[in-house]
Amino acid sequence: MFGAYIIGDEILVGKRQDKHLSFLIEALACRGLRLSWAHYLGDEPERLAAAFRRSLAAAEAVFSFGGIGATPDDHTRQCVAAAADVKLVLHPEAEREIRARFGVETTPARLRMGEFPEGSSIIPNPVNRIPGFSYGEHHFVPGFPQMARPMVEWVLDTRYRHLFDRDRWSEESILVFEAGESQLIAAMEAVGPAYPGVKVFSLPSMGEDGSRRHVELGVRGNPALVREAGEALRRSVREAGFPFSAAEKTKGAEKTKPA
């Protein structure tokens, strides 16, 4: 199971638009993995520490974006240490990277960027050499997307290659017209329990993009079951008397085309 934290007041107050979530979903999907949850958090130490404490206890793989710098509003490193009940220590590999980056201009403030919870390992930063860190299965990278992206990919390819394609999934959906979601509940309930490992979903649209009002109705999950579940769903909608058409493919999934 993979989770994500996107950290920073600048996201919550609208000064910056998050670019991490869509990237992480795609980075996982192209490796046959899936994101199970994501939380947005501000720069509040107590809330951060509580969140880290919960996910550390769950032993989940988590990517955390932002807040690992050394300015007064960066709290991630300290809160991870508090959640794990360990000390912050200057990591020797991080110190080497920072000194190699700044040379004679290395200062105590810059070295603080290499203080990680005791027991951490570093995540190399190919952009400016200031590393992120992993603590257990939690991986902490900067809030700058151009730095975070190669660092996340390095972690995935280094730490989780053995899991690639474990969660390969496919999706199949239709656009149902002249029906509201409540009118499609029976069709969804008729299909879901019959196919363990497949989720039935609905996504209504008011036609904001110029299309007809419709409900996207579909199934996603185990590729071996999706086609059969999709046919069962279409059959239920057809029997209910609602017109429908095939939906466009969704990026990041092995979509199957409705028969």
Annotated model-derived regions:
Residues V226-E228, F244, E248:
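Mixed-charge, glycine-accented linear interaction segment located at domain edges/termini
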Residues R47-A50, D74-L163:
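Proline/glycine-rich low-complexity loops and linkers
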Residues M1-A38, D43, R227:
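Glycine-rich phosphate/diphosphate-binding loop of Rossmann-like nucleotide-binding domains
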Residues I7-D9, S64-P72, P142, L203, ...:
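Glycine-rich beta-strand-to-loop/alpha-helix junction loops that act as flexible
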Residues Y40-D43, E93, L111, A179:
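Short beta->alpha linker loops
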Residues I25-A83:
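N-terminal small/polar loop signature for handling phosphorylated ligands or for N-terminal nucleophile
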Residues E137-S236:
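An accessory alpha-helical subdomain
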Residues E248-K257:
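Short, low-complexity, charge-dense intrinsically disordered segments
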